[in-house]
Structure formats: structure tokens, C-alpha cells
């Protein structure tokens, strides 16, 4: 039987203390850490940018599952990958060239 992987989101975490929140997820046995990225355009809220992803790396090697809810998504894929995203999820409607965006991932 295949092991189910747990990927808790940090969206409801205390953003003023993300390092501690990441440590809690590590201690709890999270397999991945889900990071919702919102740009205030594609979706109405604003959240985490690449510098935050990069700074969180010092707290864990748990893979970051980064969900990009931003548009145009292709402009930012490389920045998030370079910052430490291990898995990147995009919305097809967030790009005018899905093939190009997938290739960037």
C-alpha cells in the first residue's frame, strides 16, 4: 500500500513567526509544506514572495509544495524555483501559454 503524504498549508500560520511554524510542522512529521502564493490580482489576497521561500529554507529541508495563484504565472516560476520550491502548481487560466509555463517548471 502506498503511503499517503501530508502537505499542511502555512496559509493560516503566524506570518510573524514562520520559522517556528515550520519547525512545528517538521516535528509533527509533515512530508511536504504547502505554500499558497497569491498576488492580489489572480486572487484577491496577497501572501508570500520568493524571498520568504528562500529564508524558510534555513529551517527545514522538507520539500516546499508551492501553489502559484498569480498571473501571469510564467513570469514568476523561475523565481520561486530558484528560491527553493520543490513542487510548483499553477492554474492553466493564469497563463496565455500553458505549454511554456509547464516547460519552465
Predicted regions and their residues:
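Conserved N-terminal beta1-alpha1 strand-loop-helix module at the mouth
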Residues: 1-89, 93-100, 104
Amino acid at each position: 500500500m502506498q503511503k499517503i503524504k501530508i502537505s499542511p498549508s502555512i496559509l493560516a500560520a503566524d506570518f510573524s513567526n514562520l520559522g517556528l511554524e515550520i519547525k512545528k510542522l517538521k516535528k509533527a512529521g509533515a512530508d511536504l509544506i504547502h505554500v499558497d502564493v497569491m498576488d492580489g490580482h489572480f486572487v484577491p489576497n496577497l501572501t508570500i514572495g520568493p524571498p520568504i521561500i528562500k529564508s524558510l529554507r534555513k529551517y527545514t529541508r522538507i520539500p516546499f509544495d508551492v501553489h502559484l495563484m498569480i498571473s501571469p504565472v510564467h513570469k514568476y516560476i523561475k523565481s520561486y524555483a530558484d528560491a527553493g520550491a520543490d513542487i510548483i502548481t499553477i492554474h492553466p487560466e493564469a497563463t496565455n501559454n500553458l505549454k511554456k509555463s509547464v516547460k519552465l517548471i
